[in-house]
Amino acid sequence: MKDWPIVEAVPGAQEALTALHADWTLALATNADDSAEEDIWAALRRVGLDQELDKVYCYTNIGYKKPSPKFFQHILADLHLTPDQVVMIGDSYENDVLGANRSGLRAIWFNWQTSEIRETVRHRTIHELGELPGILKELK
C-alpha cells in the first residue's frame, strides 16, 4: 500500500475524521492482505490522515478478515470496548456492515458508488463522508 504509485483519500475524509476525532476513538479496519500495519500507516501519512486515526487493524496483524466475528472480537478486546460502544463504517455491505451487525456492532454503509440505501435498526447508509458527524451524533 505504501508503495502504490497513487494513494488518494476519499473526498471529505480529512474533514469528517477531524470532526469525529474529538469525540471518538478512530480505527482503520481493513481486509488488505498486501500490506502490513506499518505500510498502511505510511500510506495514511502520504494523504495526511495518520494524525486523525488512533489504531490500524489489518489481516497481517489480526490474522482474520471481515466478516469473521474473530476480526471484530479482536478489535473490541484490543480497544477494551463493548459492541454497543462501536460503530463500523465501511464500503462493503457484506464484509463491513453485515459482518459488524453479526458481531453485535452497529454499522454505517458508505455507499459512494450508487444511490441505493439499505437501513435497519442496526445500520444506516451514507453516500458522502460529510454525513458521518451528524449520523454518529445521533447514534452516540
Feature locations, PLM:
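Surface-exposed cleft-lining segments at the edges of enzyme active sites
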Residues: 1-6
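Asp-based, Mg2+/Mn2+-dependent phosphohydrolase catalytic module
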Residues: 9-14, 18-19, 27-140
